[in-house]
From Swiss-Prot:
It catalyses: ATP-dependent breakage, passage and rejoining of double-stranded DNA. GO terms for cellular component: host cell cytoplasm. One of its GO terms (molecular function) is DNA binding. Mg(2+) 1 binds at residues 438, 539. This is DNA topoisomerase 2. It is found in: Host cytoplasm. It is an enzyme of class 5 (isomerase). Residues 707-1174 form the Topo IIA-type catalytic domain. One of its GO terms (biological process) is sister chromatid segregation. Transmembrane segments: none annotated.
Length: 1192
């Protein structure tokens, strides 16, 4: 049988690390001490190894003293001082509280077989003392009754002196408890306890005597513990170390001592953490926290029940509470859902000091310095003051934001499509330029130019030019940052996750070697960059110059404005127009349209010239690229940062839409010839000029693609589609596939934004189902063009569905005669679509629409056709009984006649409450079957989207068992099967109001027809209307003026044609006499005709005036020649031909008389024509509605 050895605790404690820790020197993490006695105490790290057991010896005596101070706190005799000293290896601890009772201990005397007194038992008998069985509300730091005995068992000698007010007890213990001298007991009125000891240093790994460094380290550590105790006992008890009082009598003083070196002058946040129930409420905790970016991990000092504990649930509770506050504040501040912060992040910059007493805790760990208590004690009973958490959280979040900014500075991404210049980052880095190409086609052009080699030896090459792709688009960095002002007043710019992860912009940062924490004010800073400049190489269109280049400029202005100031940001200004003249090899190049226009006006004719536009870099042919790169430096222009640029960058790219809206209410002021000459002369472009011209033009163009013009209710894309349709289907209105027609529009109307979006616009322009945007589509759809089921999203592929022009409607709503009078968009020098139409009726208020753009929201609800017809007719017809009333209303900007929302194709109800109309769906209830059948939905609510919205509503689905959709493309039949006994509960929970009943409320069968009447103006910019009447009133003068222009132009053309036809008839009559066939040439014949008074005429202009204005007709029609006579064929000189011409003249004269009459009619020229056209439009609409917009 194996033998079991039995040893007493004394011998075991000598040899083992039980309770005290290692008995030899080891590296102790976080060991600190106070080495200075200056006015400002400072805790410093101790880097040398030390013995944990030795420190435990000293610590046990100190904790015993603070336990005694706490125990006497409520007694008559309090502890007023604790004196700790350490000199030449001798440690001493004394307090003036009631001494240890000096009485014989009967049990110990029987065991020792001699007289043993209580002080000896307390200091020499293991597992003996008052800490063996502690009460639940005990706040002593001592445990197990072994602390003082550990000190004795590891000491060469120790002297215990105590006085209880009657007697004084002195006893010496030698040789590690092996020799216990008899005590000396004498009368005394004193009260105190003092223990002096000399540890067995040699056995614990120290020199004997202590070396100078060992003495210094141990003294510093003991001094630190004395300072901790001073904070723990607080006022009323003075802690002395080597006879000098410790000046750390508060938690704030202790926190300052710890952080004075690492974070001097930092704000110390303090608080008292109180509990709400006994025994915890009797002992509030004092906490001090220092927040500083210099701290890299969470650190704490906890003096709980006098013990310097290394961890515990109280710390966990504090960290979790801080973390919750930090996360909440962080998300509120940064407003970036992708940015997350963790417990480690939120607490990594905090140093916390916690001092106080916690009842009922247990001490765990080898050295009994780990606090253990149920965590729910803190959650349930303790609360941290909100003011403390708030102030500290602000400081933490400020540091987190700063750290994010610095951390993101080193974000690495894979840089795609980058070719490094050979000298980039080297000694000649400042001579290198980074060419930032808009996309792949631009990269191809640059590569061609940079690899010309021997054919262009002095030109740019990869030696000093690098290339990078901008990917065709750039993120707006201005909207991806948060500017946060810290408590110290510093502004921190925090980039969100999207921006820091953006491969294009981050790639530019890496390639250039940019640093977000550097301003680049000095040449020394700029010399660290890998390139001397960045050159934007973008297309000469609105997307390239206005958008992409503007965003690149905004990016540099946001983070490195000094680089723009010092000419670092440039652009490659390529020719926009080249004019090739016959017989000449070198073209005339223009960089701005204004330059070309000014040049063209000076030319007598451009017949022998070929004009080519180059809006895209890919349009330049290889031989043109070679020519460009021979003069490359002359095409590189530098941006300058002028005074107004900062505000304009904020307006166009910042987050304040109201500022941008005010700026975009007006159109672009084009560059003057003087401005373009100035730009070329110095090759410098002010940023403000670029923003006010190119960027503004892009923004306005984007608006016109998203928000309709109030004159025709159309966006630019829809207008291109209509113009393309009129042209495409003019001769043959046979159906065409959507994708084929889209190609025609892109080609003839110069649509540059992709076939997918164009095809989608064509499909929408042909959709005709309940709830579709267009009540009056301009196209007839053949095939599946979508339904209300998915809101039109279920349309077929553009390859399979076809369209025709809704010609009967188009011809009446947009009279062909108007097309010659409208202003047109010119793309690449060619006429495209009108800038706007002016339809016979105000289409802008006849259809539905919704879209946001640049801070504006556009929402319209179609108005009732009958009301619109009544209003327009009343305006036009002077005999209309409401004519005078309407004109009075217009003049005084009031509303009289109704202009209600349209209810066409809608089986629900429209009701008005206050200033808004509401649309209501309909339903039937079968109480027996417990089913509600929805038979109509509110206006413009798609079926599937509606059902999904109900299913997502948890409080509604509580009452619903099943939803079944039996709806067709024309009708609504949605069965809502209720759970048993739900109907009464629904009526009870979803209260009936004046505006809706319970079922309408429950099933969301009502929507508000709230409008945002923001439209594009004829000359660009946005106009904000307050009512549909205002739109109508604004539209009326444009349509009215068009009739006068139409009649006046027709009048001018008729007069010219009558002049020409009359001259021809006269010539026929006199042709035999004139006998022009006998003359040698046309010049001689023309002289004869002139001498006989025949007018020279511009025959082509008179026959086909097309887009010529009245002024142009009057100027050029009579400045022609005699071709109209000299080109007459023999059969045209016959009497029958002459007779036909005379009849034609009579008809033209009759029409001229009619036109003159129309010009004089009341209330304005052409009023009767307008009324006729209104009738024709109404007739076409009725036919379209009766035929499901098929017109057959």
């Amino acid at each position: 049988m194996e033998a079991f050895e039995i040893s007493d605790f004394k011998e075991h404690a000598k040899k083992k690390s039980m309770w005290a820790g290692a008995l030899n020197k080891v590296t102790i993490s976080g060991l600190m001490g106070v080495f200075t006695e200056d006015e400002d105490l400072m805790a410093l790290p101790i880097h040398r190894d030390h013995c944990p057991a030795l420190l435990k010896i000293f610590d046990e005596l100190i904790v015993n003293a603070t336990d005694h101070e706490r125990a006497c706190h409520s007694k008559t005799k309090k502890v007023t001082y604790i004196k700790i000293s350490f000199d030449k290896g001798v440690f001493s601890c004394e307090n003036d509280g009631p001494g240890i009772p000096i009485a014989k201990h009967e049990q110990a005397s029987l065991i020792a077989k001699r007289d043993v007194y209580v002080p000896e038992v307390a200091s020499c008998f293991f597992l003996a003392g008052t800490n063996i069985n502690k009460a639940k509300d005990c706040i002593k730091g001592g445990t197990n009754g072994v602390g003082l005995k550990l000190a004795m068992v590891h000491s060469q000698w120790a002297i215990l002196t105590t006085a209880d007010g009657a007697q004084k007890y002195v006893q010496q213990i030698n040789q590690r408890l092996d020799i216990i001298e008899p005590p000396t007991i004498t009368p005394s009125r004193e009260m105190f306890t003092r223990i002096e000891l000399m540890p067995v240093y040699q056995e614990l790994g120290y020199a004997e005597p202590l070396s100078e460094t060992e003495q210094a380290d141990l003294s510093a550590w003991i001094y630190l513990r004395a300072c901790q105790c001073a904070a723990y006992v607080g006022k009323g008890t003075t802690i002395y170390y080597n006879d000098k009082p410790c000046r750390t009598g508060s938690v704030m003083a202790l926190a300052k001592m710890y952080t004075l070196l690492s974070a001097p002058n930092s704000t110390i946040h303090t608080a008292t953490i109180k509990a709400d129930a006994k025994p915890y409420s009797l002992h509030p905790l004092q906490v001090a926290a220092v927040v500083s970016p210099k701290f890299k991990k969470f650190e704490h000092v906890s003096i709980i029940n006098g013990v310097n504990c290394v961890k515990g649930e109280h710390v966990t509770f504090l960290k979790k509470t801080i973390n919750e506050m930090v996360i909440k504040k962080f998300q509120q501040t940064i407003k970036d859902k992708n940015r997350k912060t963790t417990l480690r992040d939120s607490c990594s910059n905090i140093f916390v000091v916690i001092v106080g007493s916690i009842p009922g805790i247990e001490w765990t760990g080898q050295r009994k310095d780990e606090l253990s208590i149920a965590e729910n004690v803190f959650k349930t009973h303790y609360s941290i003051p909100s003011s403390f958490l708030t102030s500290m959280t602000r400081s933490i979040v400020d540091i987190l934001l700063q750290s994010i900014s610095k951390k993101d500075n080193h974000k690495q991404v894979d840089v795609d499509k980058y070719t490094r210049a050979r000298n980039a980052g080297g000694k000649r880095a400042q001579d290198c330029m980074l060419l930032a190409a808009e996309g792949d086609s631009a990269l191809s052009l640059l590569r061609t130019g940079l690899t010309l080699g021997k054919s262009n030896p002095s030109g740019p090459s990869f030696d000093f030019c690098g290339m990078i792709s901008l990917g065709g688009v750039i993120m707006n960095a201005c909207k991806k940052v948060t500017n946060i002002t810290t408590d110290s007043g510093e502004t921190i710019m925090v980039r969100n996750e999207q921006l820091t992860n953006n491969k294009v912009l981050q790639g530019i940062v890496q390639v250039l070697g940019l640093d977000f924490n550097c301003h680049y004010k000095t040449q020394e800073e700029r010399a660290k960059l890998r390139y001397g400049c960045i050159v934007a190489c973008v297309d000469q269109d609105l997307d390239g110059c206005g958008k992409i280049l503007g965003l690149l400029l905004a990016y540099f202005h946001l983070f490195w404005p000094q680089l723009i100031i010092h000419g670092f940001v440039k652009r490659l200004l390529t020719p926009l127009i080249r004019v090739y003249e016959k017989g000449k090899t070198m073209p005339v190049e223009f960089y701005y349209e204004q330059e070309f226009d000014a040049w063209a006006k000076k030319q007598t004719s451009l017949v022998n010239h070929t004009v080519k536009y180059y809006k895209g870099l890919a349009a330049h042919d290889t031989h043109e690229v070679k020519s460009m790169f021979k003069h490359f430096d002359n095409m590189v222009y530098t941006f300058t940062l002028d005074d107004s640029a900062k505000e304009l960058f904020h307006i166009y790219f910042g987050g304040e839409s109201e500022l941008r809206k005010r700026e975009l209410c007006t159109g672009v002021v084009p560059l003057t010839e003087t401005q373009t000459q100035s730009i070329h002369s110095v090759r410098r472009i002010p940023c403000s000029l670029h923003l006010q011209v190119d960027t503004k033009a892009y923004k306005l163009d984007a608006i016109e693609r998203q928000i309709p013009n109030f004159l025709d209710g159309m966006t630019r894309a829809r207008r291109k589609i209509l113009a393309g349709g009129v042209k495409c289907f003019a001769s043959n209105n046979r159906e065409r596939k959507v994708f084929q027609f889209g190609g025609y529009v892109a080609d003839h109307m110069f649509y540059h934004h992709g076939d997918m979006s164009l095809n989608t616009s064509i499909i929408k322009a042909a959709q005709y189902y309940p709830g579709s945007s267009h009540l009056y589509p301009v196209f007839i759809g053949i095939g599946s063009f979508g339904s209300r089921h998915l809101g039109g999203k279920d349309a077929g592929s553009p390859r399979y569905i076809s369209v025709q022009l809704a010609s009967e409607f188009i011809k009446t709503m947009f009279p062909a005669e108007d097309s010659w009078l409208l202003p047109y968009v010119f793309e690449d020098g060619q006429r495209a679509e009108p800038e706007y139409y002016v339809p016979v009726l105000p289409l802008a208020i006849m259809e539905y629409g919704a879209n946001p753009s640049e801070g504006w929201k556009y929402t319209t609800w179609a108005r009732q056709l009958e009301d619109i017809l009544a209003l327009v007719r009343a305006y036009v017809d002077k005999d209309n009984p409401k004519h005078e009333l309407l004109h009075y209303a217009i003049k005084h900007k009031i509303t009289i006649l109704p202009l209600r929302p349209s209810n066409y194709n809608f089986k629900g109800h429209l009701k008005r409450f206050g200033q808004y109309y509401y649309s209501y769906g309909t339903y039937d209830i079968s109480e027996q079957r417990n089913i509600i059948t929805i038979t109509e939905l509110p206006l413009r609510v798609p079926t599937v989207a509606y059902i999904e919205s109900i299913k997502k509503s948890s409080n509604r689905m509580t009452f619903i068992e099943e939803i079944i959709d039996y709806s067709s493309s024309e009708t609504i039949e949605i069965l809502v099967k209720l759970k048993p006994n739900s109907l009464n509960r629904i009526v009870e929970e979803f209260k009936e109001t004046e505006e809706q009943d319970s079922i309408e409320n429950f099933l969301r069968l009502r929507n508000c027809l709230h409008s945002h009447l923001n439209f594009v103006k004829p000359k660009g910019g946005i106009i904000e209307f307050n009512s549909y009447y205002e739109i109508l009133y604004a539209w009326l003068p444009y349509r009215r003026e068009l009739y006068q222009k139409r009649l006046m132009r027709e009048h001018a053309v008729l007069k010219l044609r009558i002049i020409m036809e009359t001259a021809i008839v006269r010539y026929i009559n006199e042709s035999a006499e004139l006998n022009l066939s006998h003359y040698e040439d046309e010049k001689e014949a023309s002289r004869i005709l002139s001498e006989h008074g025949f007018p020279p005429l511009n025959h082509t202009l008179i026959i086909s005036p097309e887009f010529a204005s009245i002024e142009e007709l009057n100027q050029k029609a009579l400045q022609g020649c005699y071709t109209y006579i000299l080109s007459l064929q023999a059969r045209e000189l016959l009497i029958a031909a002459k007779t036909r011409r005379v009849e034609k003249i009579k008809k033209m004269q009759a029409r001229l008389d009619k036109v003159e009459q129309l010009l004089q009619e009341s209330p304005f020229p052409g009023a009767s024509v307008w009324l006729e056209e209104i009738d024709a439009v109404e007739k076409a609409i009725i036919k379209g509605r009766n035929t499901q917009w098929k017109f057959h």
